[in-house]
């Protein structure tokens, strides 16, 4: 979730 896998926007 660090701009690698845009599935769960935790740190957007």
UniProtKB/Swiss-Prot annotation:
Specify the signal sequence span: none
Provide the GO MF annotations for this entry: tetrahydromethanopterin S-methyltransferase activity
| Single GO BP term | methanogenesis
Where's it mainly located? membrane
* Gene Ontology cellular component terms for the protein in this record: plasma membrane
Keyword Methyltransferase listed = yes
Report disulfide bridges, numbered on this chain: none
Subcellular location per UniProt equals:
Cell membrane
Question: Its topology with respect to the membrane?
Answer: Multi-pass membrane protein
The UniProt record lists the EC number as 7.2.1.4
Q: Which reaction does it catalyse?
A: 5-methyl-5,6,7,8-tetrahydromethanopterin + coenzyme M + 2 Na(+)(in) = 5,6,7,8-tetrahydromethanopterin + methyl-coenzyme M + 2 Na(+)(out)
* The protein's role, per its UniProt record: This enzyme complex catalyzes an intermediate step in methanogenesis, the formation of methyl-coenzyme M and tetrahydromethanopterin from coenzyme M and N5-methyl-tetrahydromethanopterin.
Q: How does it assemble?
A: Composed of six different subunits.
For this entry, the protein name equals: Alternative tetrahydromethanopterin S-methyltransferase 28 kDa subunit
């Amino acid at each position: 979730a660090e701009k690698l896998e845009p599935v769960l926007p935790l740190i957007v």
